[in-house]
C-alpha cells in the first residue's frame, strides 16, 4: 500500500 492509503476512506 502506498503512503497515505486509507482502508477506511
Curated annotation (Swiss-Prot):
Expressed by the skin glands. One of its GO terms (cellular component) is extracellular region. GO terms for biological process: defense response; vasodilation. Keywords: Amphibian defense peptide, G-protein coupled receptor impairing toxin, Hydroxylation, Secreted, Toxin, Vasoactive, Vasodilator. Coiled coil: none annotated. GO terms for molecular function: toxin activity. It is found in: Secreted. Signal peptide: none annotated. Its main location: secreted. The modification 4-hydroxyproline is found at residue 3. Produces in vitro relaxation of rat arterial smooth muscle and constriction of intestinal smooth muscle. May target bradykinin receptors (BDKRB). Belongs to the bradykinin-related peptide family. This is Bradykinin. It comes from Pithecopus hypochondrialis (Orange-legged leaf frog).
Amino acid at each position: 500500500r502506498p503512503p497515505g492509503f486509507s482502508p477506511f476512506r
